[in-house]
């Protein structure tokens, strides 16, 4: 028992030895100024970083100077920032207005990150002096209106982010939208959507037609006048596929004929093979109207009064075989309208007021190059001097060296170079050729 007691006493003495130094440790922690070693210097470094004299980090990475001033509750640009900065990170601050000449002294700036601030106004010369700026991030702010004029001073701008802003899509945005839709600006303003008016909410800026925003008729539709009578009007959607008839046999068909539609329905079932939109009031085809209907093979758009087809309207219709555009108001096709129709076989073009000038050349040469596409109805309606001519005849005369007054006189009964007759003959014989089979047996 004595031996056990001695051992316990010895253990207690050993355990009490470290506690003797603890008061000194506590004193050194309570007064860090007494510490002159490396540990003391490390402890003071965070204080220097967030000192009022230098609220932001300036560093060099891959030989390019950066200013990192994110999450500092800034409301303006500080005057003591270096002028030779190449990249400026100002995200997640409290900036509300970008004033004229705000960044004028940073002439070497390449990228400017202003996302997740509270920006609601950008003055016309806010980016003055930024001749070398290539990247500008303005997403997640409160911007409603902006014009092309603000970007006059950024000729090298190639990457612009504008999404998650409550864009007010009216005539004030016309110049900005026109700038974003220039083909070379394919990385400017992607994913930005309208926040108002309600009729255009969630519509991408790149899908809008700038001229529509300033059209008086469109304004009346977006901002209707209050009703005089107390009876509420029945609101019917302009484009709702539930108004159409869906047939499964013999093929998946959506019949939207004579439904008073003004736009292509946005909720077309993706497995539809045949779509009939004839005899409606669709005046133009917007970009990517049919991008979700991948299986579509037959599309009827006749008798709508279509005046314009966007070059990206048929994007995604790689399986389309038949397209009926007859009895509309088409005068020509913009370059690129037919580029995605790889397997097109039949194209109806009759009863359109085709205008024979240089703009018709794209359609003619596309058909000439895609000789497997059978078409009809490509006849000049205007100008008067070419009325009744086939478009092919007009294009050939366009490149003749003789002046117009020396061209041979064509009788008015000229039969369109027999293009339509040849098409009908080929179309008539086509089913018979499809059933011919040649079998070769190799011994």
From Swiss-Prot:
Residues 1-15 form the signal peptide. Induction: Down-regulated in osteoblasts in response to pro-osteoclastogenic factors. GO terms for biological process: bone marrow development; negative regulation of osteoclast differentiation; ossification. It is found in: Secreted, Extracellular space. The keyword DNA damage does not apply. It holds the Pfam family LRR_8. Disulfide bonds: none annotated. Its main location: secreted. This is Leucine-rich repeat-containing protein 17. It comes from Mus musculus. The lineage of its organism: Eukaryota, Metazoa, Chordata, Craniata, Vertebrata. The gene is Lrrc17.
């Amino acid at each position: 028992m004595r031996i056990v007691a001695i051992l316990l006493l010895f253990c207690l003495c050993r355990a009490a030895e470290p506690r003797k130094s603890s008061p000194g440790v506590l004193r050194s922690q309570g007064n860090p100024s007494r510490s002159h070693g490396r540990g003391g210097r490390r402890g003071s470094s965070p204080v220097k970083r967030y000192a009022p004299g230098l609220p932001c980090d300036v560093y060099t990475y891959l030989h390019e100077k950066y200013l990192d001033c994110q999450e500092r509750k800034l409301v303006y640009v500080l005057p003591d920032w270096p002028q030779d900065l190449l990249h400026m990170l100002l995200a997640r601050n409290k900036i509300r207005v970008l004033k004229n000449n705000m960044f004028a002294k940073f002439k070497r700036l390449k990228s400017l990150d202003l996302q997740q601030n509270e920006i609601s106004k950008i003055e016309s010369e806010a980016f003055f002096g930024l001749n070398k700026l290539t990247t500008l991030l303005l997403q997640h702010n409160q911007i409603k209106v902006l014009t092309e004029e603000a970007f006059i001073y950024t000729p090298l701008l190639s990457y612009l982010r504008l999404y998650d802003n409550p864009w007010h899509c009216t005539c004030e945005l016309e110049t900005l939208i026109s700038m974003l839709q220039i083909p070379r600006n394919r990385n400017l303003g992607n994913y930005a959507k309208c926040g108002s008016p309600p009729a255009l909410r969630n519509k991408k800026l790149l899908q809008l037609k700038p001229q529509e925003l300033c059209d008086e008729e469109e304004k009346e539709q977006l901002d209707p006048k209050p009703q005089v009578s107390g009876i509420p009007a029945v609101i019917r959607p302009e484009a709702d596929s539930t108004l159409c008839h869906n047939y499964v046999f013999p093929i998946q068909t959506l019949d939207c004929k004579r439904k008073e539609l003004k736009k292509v329905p946005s909720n077309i079932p993706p497995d539809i093979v045949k779509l009939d939109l004839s005899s409606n009031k669709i005046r133009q085809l917007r970009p990517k109207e049919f991008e979700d209907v991948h299986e579509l093979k037959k599309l009827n758009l006749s008798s709508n009064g279509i005046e314009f087809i966007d070059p990206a309207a048929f994007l995604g219709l790689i399986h389309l075989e038949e397209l009926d555009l007859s009895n509309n108001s088409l005068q020509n096709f913009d370059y690129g309208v037919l580029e995605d129709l790889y397997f097109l076989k039949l194209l109806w073009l009759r009863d359109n007021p085709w205008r024979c000038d240089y703009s018709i050349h794209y359609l003619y040469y596309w058909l000439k190059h895609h000789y497997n596409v059978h078409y009809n109805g490509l006849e000049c309606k205007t100008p008067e001097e070419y009325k009744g001519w086939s478009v092919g005849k007009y294009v050939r005369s366009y490149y003749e060296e003789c002046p117009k007054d020396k061209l041979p006189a064509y009788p008015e009964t000229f039969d369109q170079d027999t293009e339509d007759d040849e098409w009908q003959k080929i179309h008539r014989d086509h089913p018979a050729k499809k059933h011919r089979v040649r079998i070769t047996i190799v011994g």
